[in-house]
Amino acid sequence: QRLNINDNHPDLSVDQKKHILKKLNQAVSFESFLHTKYVGQKRFSLEGGESLIPAIDSLILAADDLGVEEFVMGMAHRGRLSTLANIFGKSTKDIFSEFDGKDYDDEVFDGDVKYHMGWTSKIDPNKDGKKINISLAPNPSHLETVGAVVQGIARAKLENNYSSDTSKVLPILVHGDAAIAGQGLAYEIVQMAKLKGYATGGTIHIVVNNQIGFTTNYLDARTSTYCTDIGKVTLSPVMHVNADDVEAVVHAVLFALSYRMKFKDRKSVV
C-alpha cells in the first residue's frame, strides 16, 4: 500500500526540497574546499555520493518525529569527514586543523588519523526543544569492524536506558559496496539480527556503491549480482536507488525507516 502511494515516487514538500538542497550544497562545498585547500592529502572524499548527507539528515529528522531518542552510527572512512561536519556538527575549524597537522595533548587525543575519528553530539533536529543523542563510533581501516561494535552499543543502550524498547534507539550502518559483499563480519551481523541475545530492533544499512573496491572492479569482487544480496539471507527489504537522484535517495531512506519502526521484526533494511 505504501509503495502504491504516488506511484512510489518522492512526495516532498517545497520546504523539504529546500532543506535537502541545503544539505547537499553543504556536502558539495565541503569536499570542494578540501580538494582546493589540501591538494593531495588523504580525505576519502564523498564526491559522487554526496546524497548520503541529505539522506542521513532526513533519516534523523523523521526518526525524531517518530520518538527515536538515540542514534548509533558506524561507517568506514569514505565520507566520514563530511558526515562529521554536516551531520554531527564537528567544527570545520577542528577538521581543518587536523589537515594542518595541529598538535594535540596525548591526554585528550588518541593519535589516530582524522578519517577514523568518532563523535557524539546532542542536537535538536526539528527545532522543537527536544534534544537527541547521535553518536558516530570510531572505526579503523579494518572495514566493517565497527558494525558489530555499533550493534553492541545499541543493545547496551536499549537494555540499560530504555527497558529494551527498540523504538528508542536506531542503529545505522554505512557500507561500501566491496566491503558489505566481501567482509564476513557483515554476514555475521545480518545473521545475528533476529537472535534474542543480540537483536537491536533492526538496523538501517546504507550502501554507498562506487562500483570499485580500492582498485578492484566490482565484476572481479563478488559472485552475487548485487553487493546487497547479503540482505536476502534474512529476507530483509533491499532497495536500489540512483545516488544522482537525491530526492529518490531520501524517499528510499524514509521508506526504510517506516518499515523498521512499523513492523519491529528485528530485520535489517538495506
Model regions and ranges:
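Conserved thiamine diphosphate
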Residues: 127, 226-249
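A broad detector of short, well-ordered amphipathic alpha-helices
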Residues: 61, 229, 250-254
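Active-site capping/gating regions of soluble enzymes
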Residues: 216, 239-265
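Conserved small/polar residues in nucleotide/adenosyl-binding loops
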Residues: 269
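Conserved internal helical-beta-strand scaffold that buttresses enzyme catalytic cores
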Residues: 1-172, 178-186, 190-204, 209, ...
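Hydrophobic/aromatic ligand-binding patch that stacks against planar heteroaromatic rings
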Residues: 195, 230, 259
